Amino acid sequence: VLNPGSSWIENISSFGQNGTRQILLESSTIPQLGLQKRLSYLLSYPYGCLEQTVSAAFAQLYLDKWVQLNPQQEKQRIKHIQSAIQQINRFQLPSGGFSYWPGNYQFDEWISSYTGQFLIEAKMAGFLVPSMMLKKWEKFQIKLVKGISLNAVWASSEVTQMNQAYRLYTLALSGKPEKGAMNQMRELKSIYSPAANRLAGAYAVTGNKETGNRLLTGKNKKATSIGKTATYGSDIRDRAQMLETYIQLGNPQKSGELAALLSKEFSSGNWHSTHATACVLLALSKYLGEQKAGAPAAFKFQARETKGTWMEVQHTQPIGFTQIQDFVGKQKIRIQNTGKSKLFLQLIQSGKESLGEVKASASGIELSTHFFTAEGLELDPAEIPQGIDFQAEIRVKHTGENPYSYKDLGLTQVFPSGWEIINERMNDFSLNQNNDFDFMDLKDDQTSYFFSLAEGQAKKFTVKLNATFSGKYYFPAATVTDMYHVPIHAQTTGKWISVARAKTN
């Protein structure tokens, strides 16, 4: 924290491989959120399910309202959102709903509502959204809303309540409110808090703020882990969606309290899923975008690149980023607050670790990679003759130390550039119907699997390879993580391998 007229000196050392290093100075007139770290996490997330595609774009939708973006950054923001809208089309089913993975035939209730909310708000923000995509989605939502009957089973189901309330909210947002279903749900004797919140938002959007406020002040049931797991949720996700509702209800006191709470949690550095991260950034964007602008941030800094001179920086939005030139070794950075506002500063360094620095780790799951010849004999990958076909067998196992199933695991193995993957996916029907995974993503040099594991269950995934190019190569670590529960993870070590040149006659 730097008061007006104060200075700050920081000694930093270079980090990461050449060509991967980046140093940013995040300056803010509001308490730090760790915004750059959160955005980088969303934008660099390696998988491409619909939730993660939408989350990366949704978090940027209102970014220009509270973050100082240069022309290039603004161009990138717009391009990313437009690209996401185009990609979403691959996930829409004939029913109008959306699947979690492209090519899947089962719609996901929560993600269908989440995607619809993004498309509606993107359209409101001036982005071109295909009208047919929205019309099909609206019909799908209305059909599901009308298909719910208020029987005893439904009335007590947390997951069904949450999905129904989110559908009602998104339809209201789209200008197609199902008021009869809204009133029926409001009259339930017992309603879970996240569902009551989304229903209150539906009433707020349709102009009935009084009913919305009553829903939030009622004795609602607390959300459980069952509801959170089924809707990719968490406590912070639910608070973020509640902040959206209080903004819509015009309650500045509650909005301010929740915004402060979310900001504090985000600045802690704790891990949050892509969905939770996007929901928080979306809610804070809406809150901060409505606040009156204070005094602009103004400071000057000295670094190695300035060669002893001071570089002046100003931004009128609450948050700004200043790129510091890459360097090798150590350097001293001096910053002086020349403005009238208190400054919250953070230096952010990023870069890929040097080869060989990745260490094995595991929590709740075991991971290993084994190699075999085409005849099934075990093979040492340290040195493989050029030209031979062989296979990698990646094994994962639920250790059983956690008494529940892992539902959203993502496993990735990148292979050395001297090896080539033999792609049999297109001509092997069994691969596309494999019950061991929900989705497989095969690229030139890597393969990713997305699957679930029951308690104590083990699975193995086989990749056929060819030792194509002679030479020495780095074999990166394999990783497996639970995409919505980060303590569940495992990583192997990276190592050097070689492909021995084939002998010529």
Functional labels for PLM-detected ranges:
Residues V1-E158, Q164-A165, I319-T369:
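Extended, solvent-exposed functional surface patches
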Residues V1-I23, W154-N505:
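Long, domain-scale non-catalytic interaction/scaffolding regions in large secretory-pathway
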